[in-house]
């Protein structure tokens, strides 16, 4: 006897949630692991810290510039298909990242890995939202957020153990067997979404959007530590021994006027806006942003939330290891207080969030996050470990109040056929915020440091670093306060 349709749908929604969460777990796990092994990568490749950090930055740039495009592409051609494709690309990128013999190879394969991660992340929340009825979406999204932050919490500790015992390359190889096991499961368990065959891809808009964001992020990342007139990039040699010692440049140098990249970013942005208003099926529906106040505000609050706090774990990690001389493994477990707090509190938020509007929860989360950043701005060389842990826990509580209600309100404010696009736009704001946060944090701290810190083995001034760290957290506090007001003025429907 066949099962009633209601039972089938009930089983499918939970199966979907489990399968999507397990597959999506790999991307944030990788992000958390890689952030911890950057010093080892710099040491092995004999490259400067300012270059090695691009192993993380370039990953975020790809996510930022392509998530919206991939969201529209998945709306047109099917979300399940490109969720599976994304998992496959992520596995391939992970394998070759582990095989990299130069920093150039690693950066190239991190781009490939990030393309796969973008396809996974842009479709995950849309697939979950499609599977659940409106009254259960907050709970489903809270579980999804819990899984993501469980991965982030696991990443640093797992990365520290793997690096210490079997080497940093294995943090990339870890994704390969897990991904290969998941591929047939995802393919067989998920249903394909309805396809919007009457829509076309906006490739021109994608190009100008990616160009504008890339120019902006490069300018912020490199500009403050360079001269007041130009950004100077020196490339002695880039080669790929894996592919027969192919040489791209030899003793090549380029000097970019400091104002050129921001100006190019503005020009590309203006062209992008013009293109989007004329496009039949734009990747960024500016009309939807202008007509849907809830959709606009949820995107803006996400941008301000992640810009304000995302650099905290990276900055505190360096503080613990360089200033307090704490072992990397111990530091990793200390840092896990933040994501573990999100894991513990997110389920409770999802269960009781029906009693409070997403507007109030988002604003409260931003406010609590702002308090934690204000506390961190008082950090000194002699601050107790308890002070740091309490600050991270408060930040985790703030993010848990924000992380599920905000995307749920965002995706519920659009029609089903636009949910991958909406999730892509929200993901773009999230990753743009993360990229800006890292760039602002590194630039602020860099202004307080001498030049030799950017070289492997360079010395560091304790007072200079902590002074820059405090200023970076205070800037984050100001950004969070602005985000509170944006959250409060939005509508609930």
Language-model regions: role of each:
Residues 127, 161, 189, 218, ...:
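A residue-level signal for alpha-helical anchor/packing sites in multi-pass solute transporters
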Residues 146, 150-166, 214, 218, ...:
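A gly/Pro-rich, aromatic-decorated transmembrane alpha-helix motif that marks the paired
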Residues 24, 60, 141-149, 153, ...:
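Small-residue-rich transmembrane alpha-helices and their cytosolic helix-loop interfaces
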Residues 13-62, 252-260, 278-407, 415-417:
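Transmembrane core module of solute transporters
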Residues 18-19, 66, 77-87, 103-104, ...:
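C-terminal module of multi-pass small-molecule transporters
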Residues 2-188, 345, 349, 353, ...:
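Transmembrane-helix bundle of Major Facilitator Superfamily
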Residues 100, 116, 132-133, 289-290, ...:
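Short helix-loop-helix connector
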Residues 164-300:
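Hydrophobic transmembrane-helix bundles of small-molecule transporters
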């Amino acid at each position: 006897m066949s099962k009633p349709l209601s039972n089938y749908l009930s089983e499918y929604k939970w199966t979907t949630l489990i399968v999507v969460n397990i597959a999506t777990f790999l991307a944030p796990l990788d992000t958390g692991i890689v952030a911890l092994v950057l010093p080892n990568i710099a040491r092995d490749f004999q490259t400067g810290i300012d270059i090695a950090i691009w192993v993380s930055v370039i990953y975020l740039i790809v996510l930022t510039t392509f998530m919206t495009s991939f969201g529209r592409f998945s709306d047109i051609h099917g979300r399940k298909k490109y969720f599976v494709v994304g998992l496959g690309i992520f596995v391939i990128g992970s394998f070759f990242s582990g095989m990299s013999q130069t920093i150039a190879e690693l950066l190239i394969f991190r781009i490939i890995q990030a393309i796969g991660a973008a396809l996974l992340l842009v479709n995950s929340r849309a697939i979950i939202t499609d599977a659940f009825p409106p009254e259960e979406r907050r709970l489903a999204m809270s579980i999804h957020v819990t899984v993501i932050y469980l991965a982030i919490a696991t990443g640093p500790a797992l990365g520290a153990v793997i690096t210490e015992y079997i080497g940093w390359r294995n943090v990339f190889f870890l994704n390969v067997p897990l991904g290969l096991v998941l591929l047939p499961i995802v393919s067989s368990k998920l249903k394909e979404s309805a396809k919007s065959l009457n829509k076309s891809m906006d490739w021109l808009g994608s190009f100008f959007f990616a160009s504008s964001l890339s120019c902006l992020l490069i300018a912020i990342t490199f500009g403050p530590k360079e001269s007041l007139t130009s950004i100077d990039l020196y490339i002695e040699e880039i080669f790929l021994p894996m592919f027969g010692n192919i040489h791209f440049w030899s003793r090549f140098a380029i000097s970019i006027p400091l104002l050129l990249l921001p100006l190019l970013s503005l020009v590309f942005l203006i062209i992008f806006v013009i293109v989007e208003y004329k496009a039949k099926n734009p990747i960024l529906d500016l009309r939807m942003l202008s007509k849907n106040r809830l959709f606009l505000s949820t995107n803006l609050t996400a941008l301000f939330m992640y810009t304000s706090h995302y650099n905290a774990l990276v900055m505190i990690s360096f503080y613990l290891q360089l200033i307090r001389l704490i072992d990397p493994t111990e530091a990793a477990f200390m840092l896990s207080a933040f994501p573990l707090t999100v894991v513990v509190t997110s389920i409770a938020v999802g269960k009781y969030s029906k009693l409070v509007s997403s507007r109030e929860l988002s604003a409260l989360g931003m406010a609590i996050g702002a308090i934690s950043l204000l506390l961190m701005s008082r950090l000194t060389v002699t601050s107790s470990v308890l002070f740091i842990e309490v600050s991270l826990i408060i930040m985790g509580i703030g993010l848990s109040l924000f992380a599920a209600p905000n995307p749920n309100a965002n995706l519920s404010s659009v029609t089903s056929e636009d949910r991958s696009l909406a999730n892509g736009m929200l993901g773009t704001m999230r990753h743009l915020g993360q990229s800006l946060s890292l760039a602002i944090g590194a630039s602020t701290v860099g202004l307080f440091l001498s030049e030799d810190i950017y070289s492997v083995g360079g010395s560091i001034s304790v007072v200079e670093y902590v002074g820059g760290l405090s200023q970076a957290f205070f800037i984050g506090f100001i950004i969070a306060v602005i985000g509170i007001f944006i959250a409060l003025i939005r509508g609930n429907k």
